[in-house]
Amino acid sequence: MYKAYLLIFNSMKQKKQFIFLLLGLSLCFSHSVYGESGTNDEKTKTISFRGIYADDPSGREGLYNPERGLRLEIAVDIANKKDVWNPKQFPDITGHLESESAIYASDSISLVQSYFYLTGFAGKSLSEEAFSTMDTYFNKLRELDKKAVLRFAYETAFMGRAETGPTLDDVLRHMEQLKPFLAQNADVIQVVQAGFIGAWGEWHSSYHGLEKSDASKRTILEKILWMTPENRMVQVRVPEYKNLIDKNSQQYNRTSFHDDFIIIKPHKWDGGMHEGSPHFNQIVRESPYLIIDGELPWGTWSMNEDPDNPEAGWIVDGKATARQLFLQHYTSLSAIHNYKEKGTSDKYSMIYWKETPVDEAFLQENRMPVSAGYFQNRDGSPAQRNVFDYIRDHLGYRLELQQLQISGKPAAGKEISLDLSLINRGFSTLFNEHPVYFVLIDEQGKVTEFLTDTNVHDFQPYDPKDSECTPLIHTIKGKFTVPQDLAAGTYKVGLWIPDGSERLKYNSRYAIRCANGDMEWWNSSDNNYGVNILATLEISPR
């Protein structure tokens, strides 16, 4: 599946419009905005939409959407069924996850970096109880309407402090066991990170020196790619690891990046990933088609409150970070690091970001995405925005509908045409499975679905080869014939983009909400549907 949509990326990435045919729907439309009348009682109607103004309802809050944005971080000791770092406070499987979800609820979190520590299984196979523990965690993620940025690890100490660790045979044996388990839970996995080796699964400081051989690193990475469902990507810590595998292979194209040390300025621990380095440039070049994740160092570390950092403390620059996240098409960023950590004598970086204004001139100078009304109130007066909110709002995708055009005769058995245009104002396109439907909603809330051929992976913010980063306009286009047996009456027509899995499809929290301040977001009473309402339709009898 991934190979198929990768081919679509490569063949269509320079197009500025994407046209998708829809089969089998028939509707008749009525709206307050009418265009030019056609012949034979046909009309063309045009409805324009706008982005979100600062003083729109919830206009300064994050727009909750699946598989994008700020993320949490949770580490579970699978053998002992408790939190790795706070076992006394969270002596169970999901307590920390529930606590952090509540603390960060205002930050519109839909992703959780989920560490499964297999420390207790070095030298032996994973038990049935281990899989039951992981199942419990995944089920809680579903209950909380979140997905996992998944990483497996064994060792919790670095710089030669690890007391034990897995052998290569341990790692490979566990991956054999994990493959079917991950396939069963692919719905709740956004991406898999290439862990397993060394401290925190970051491919350094391993007890048995697994990272010291290119051969062992290549073997482990290729096995992780084999273990991971084919329709999911695998992220590595630095491009150096990705470059160990064949550049012409499908595995290479499925391999993405996570930068666990975003500090902007060069540093000996940055993995050679600062701006201007070959690694930085490789990520810029490949990231339009990859899921990119990252995190700042811990606030205690960057503020020189950690014994492992003897340097002077500093604040990670917010505007420079926003620019890097844009250049490298970031989908997600940790909200756990350098934000709400406790016990500091000063504020951490992300709190300073909330106090750092960002303006349209800076974004235009750096060709960064922004909606026309992002820096305005509804009355046209200027509105100030800060760099934290800008990053929160633009990580991943941000679909802003532009215009709906409807033409045709509003009668049963007659054909109408529908064109819906949009711009992706986010840093990246969409990934994984998100089918696109038009839906009809009657006055009783009954929903009728019409699947389109739209491929959301094509929704690039701009052509990656365009140095001006001009926003692309994408079009969903369809022709429909009004069904003969559709009851006459008033309907809402909407855009529904659910999760692609059968398990999560009918969960409104996994449906994609467009970034439009003048559009109703409709939830069905059973929470099966989350729909962007486009127009009111008056369907007439023949």
Label each residue range with its predicted role:
Residues F326-Q403:
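Catalytic cores of secreted or luminal carbohydrate-active enzymes
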Residues V149-F158, L178-E211:
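Active-site groove signature of glycoside hydrolases
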Residues L97-Y154:
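Aromatic-lined substrate-binding rim segments of carbohydrate-active enzymes
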Residues V191-G198, E202, S206-E360:
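Catalytic-core regions of glycoside hydrolase
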Residues L21-C28:
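Bacterial N-terminal signal peptides
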Residues G38-A105:
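Boundary/entry segment of secreted carbohydrate-active catalytic domains
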